[in-house]
């Protein structure tokens, strides 16, 4: 297997006295292998994974506290509803009460 792309099945004439320089070397099929480089510099130390220690103990900044106070109604997470149920139910209910009271007043 080690002499895969070097013409192992054919007798080599270059070994019988002729230099191998003028004959080009056949390349193996497929992607060429990666050439290994010698490490020139020492490897950097690995950084620890995950959340750093003590990051949970920090108090929020003043700007974040003001922002939290100004937010009124909190929306649920995820994709918003196509037809918000609260808005659709409240408006027709108020309109129907007003129209029914107007109709009853007109009938009398």
Curated annotation (Swiss-Prot):
Keyword ATP-binding recorded: no
Gene from which this protein is expressed: Hmga2
Phosphoprotein in keyword set: yes
SUBUNIT field: Interacts with E4F1. Interacts with NEK2.
Function text: Functions as a transcriptional regulator. Functions in cell cycle regulation through CCNA2. Plays an important role in chromosome condensation during the meiotic G2/M transition of spermatocytes. Plays a role in postnatal myogenesis, is involved in satellite cell activation. Positively regulates IGF2 expression through PLAG1 and in a PLAG1-independent manner.
Pfam family, one: AT_hook
Tissue-wise expression: Expressed in mitotic spermatogonia, meiotic spermatocytes, and postmeiotic round spermatids (at protein level). Expressed in embryonic myogenic progenitor cells.
Residue stretches of biased makeup (Basic and acidic residues): 66-75
One example GO MF annotation: enzyme binding
Annotated protein name in UniProt: High mobility group protein HMGI-C
Phosphothreonine modifications at: 40
Cellular component aspect of the GO annotation: male germ cell nucleus; nuclear chromosome; nucleus; protein-DNA complex; senescence-associated heterochromatin focus; SMAD protein complex
Chain ranges passing through the membrane: none
Species per Swiss-Prot/TrEMBL record: Mus musculus
UniProt-annotated stretches for the region Disordered: 1-108
Description of post-translational modifications: Regulated by cell cycle-dependent phosphorylation which alters its DNA binding affinity. Phosphorylated by NEK2.
GO biological process: one example: negative regulation of single stranded viral RNA replication via double stranded DNA intermediate
Compositional bias ranges of the Basic residues kind: 46-56
Alphabetically ordered keywords of this record: Acetylation, Cell cycle, Cell division, DNA condensation, DNA-binding, Growth regulation, Meiosis, Mitosis, Nucleus, Phosphoprotein, Repeat, Transcription, Transcription regulation
């Amino acid at each position: 297997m080690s002499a895969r792309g070097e013409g192992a099945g054919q007798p080599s004439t270059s070994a019988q006295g002729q230099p191998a320089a003028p004959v080009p070397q056949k390349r193996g099929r497929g992607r060429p292998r990666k050439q290994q480089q010698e490490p020139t510099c020492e490897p950097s130390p690995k950084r620890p994974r995950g959340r750093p220690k003590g990051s949970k103990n920090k108090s929020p900044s003043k700007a974040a506290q003001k922002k939290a106070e100004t937010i009124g109604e909190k929306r649920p997470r995820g994709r918003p509803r196509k037809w918000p149920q609260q808005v659709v139910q409240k408006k027709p209910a108020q309109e129907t009460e007003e129209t029914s009271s107007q109709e009853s007043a007109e009938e009398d």
